[in-house]
């Protein structure tokens, strides 16, 4: 009970003294600190596991907090727990690159947190990225459709500039659904987008389902679905419902979960906000720009957020830690805004 009171008190202090997820460095206003709280145990010395404390962790840290991550033993006397597909994104869709992580462990005898220099949290930016763009090309977009194609092309350019080996595929839809296979050939992708033409109706859910199929067939460390629409589905087969799509996103058949980002252009007033918000799953974000100019900014921010993804690795020894006496861990993540 004492630990949880301390944690609550610390969380209160942080909320009163910080902006957003953490403190701001006065010498670098783009730099902030974010916090991740973890429970750790290792019942046999070779089977480390962690769960997350979502209540005290900074909301900007985008992880699937419902997961329990299991690790492995590494000779001669180490264990590694990999936390994959981590992003730092604030409420304004500003993405942060990770500059460093400091580890702390709650020490009962000190009644305080103690910095840990032996057990560390390492981080690497993911370079093996697969993205499927699901793009609405319905007639309701009107003249804005040419801007959508421009923004989608810029998105491709930005992602490939950050990760040259990233593979990007396209699903485009109106009354018909078409697709372009994933590749890192920028010219081929942009030429395909330039060839898109508008049509009637909105086959949204079926198109998202195809995008999930494409991602599940791909091998990658990180998989992302980017969905853009300006309307609600009115042309998919009845089996393709929001519930069906959400179930597929949350129960993918591949080892890597799909992170989904959704954009609903509000100009025509027809987007289904609750559905698109739920569809932004597994650490993704959603945005509802009110016009084409705002839409361009969203595509730009999402290109940075999607490309800037990390795998974290918690390194510790093989000491037995019973699940009845889990270690309370705190990680302070220093990050710099990339796209504000």
Task: Show which residues each predicted segment covers.
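C-terminal motif of bacterial Sec signal peptides marking the signal peptidase cleavage site
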Residues: 15-18
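Acidic, polar low-complexity linker/tail segments
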Residues: 20-28, 72-132, 139-146
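Acidic/polar, low-complexity intrinsically disordered N-terminal segments immediately downstream
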Residues: 22-76
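…and closely analogous acidic/polar surface helices at protein-protein or active-site interfaces
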Residues: 106, 120-134, 138-168, 181-188, ...
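DG-centered beta-turn motif at the end of beta-strands
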Residues: 135-137, 148, 170-173, 211, ...
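Von Willebrand factor
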Residues: 176-223, 233, 264-272
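VWA/integrin I-like adhesion module and closely mimicked acidic/polar interface patches used
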Residues: 231-282, 294, 300-301
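C-terminal "exit" segments of structured domains
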Residues: 288-340
């Amino acid at each position: 009970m004492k630990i949880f009171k301390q944690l609550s008190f610390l969380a209160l202090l942080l909320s009163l003294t910080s902006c957003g997820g953490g403190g701001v460095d006065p010498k670098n206003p783009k730099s902030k600190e974010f916090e991740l709280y973890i429970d750790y145990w290792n019942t046999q010395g070779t089977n480390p596991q962690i769960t997350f404390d979502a209540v005290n962790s900074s909301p900007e840290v985008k992880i699937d907090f419902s997961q329990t991550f299991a690790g492995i033993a590494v000779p001669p006397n180490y264990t590694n727990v990999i936390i994959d597909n981590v992003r730092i994104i604030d409420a304004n869709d500003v993405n942060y690159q990770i500059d460093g992580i400091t580890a702390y462990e709650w020490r009962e005898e000190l009644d305080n947190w103690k910095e840990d220099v032996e057990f560390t949290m390492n981080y690497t930016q993911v370079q093996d990225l697969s993205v499927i763009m699901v793009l609405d090309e319905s007639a309701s977009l009107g003249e804005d459709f040419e801007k959508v194609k421009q923004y989608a092309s810029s998105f491709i350019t930005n992602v490939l500039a950050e990760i040259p080996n990233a593979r990007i595929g396209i699903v485009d839809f109106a009354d018909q659904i078409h697709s372009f296979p994933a590749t890192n050939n920028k010219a081929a992708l942009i030429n395909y987008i330039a060839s898109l033409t508008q049509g009637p109706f909105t086959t949204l859910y079926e198109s998202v389902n195809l995008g999930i199929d494409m991602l599940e067939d791909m091998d990658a460390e990180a998989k992302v679905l980017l969905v853009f629409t300006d309307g609600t589905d009115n042309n998919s087969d009845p089996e393709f419902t929001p519930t069906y799509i959400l179930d597929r996103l949350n129960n993918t058949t591949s080892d890597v979960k799909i992170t989904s980002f959704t954009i609903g252009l509000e100009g025509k007033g027809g987007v289904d906000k609750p559905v698109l918000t739920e569809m932004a799953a597994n650490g993704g974000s959603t945005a509802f720009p009110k016009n084409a100019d705002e839409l361009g900014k969203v595509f730009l921010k999402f290109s940075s957020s999607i490309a800037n993804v990390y795998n974290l690795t918690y390194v510790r020894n093989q000491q037995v830690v019973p699940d009845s006496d889990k270690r309370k861990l705190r990680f302070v993540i220093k990050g710099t805004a990339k796209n504000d």
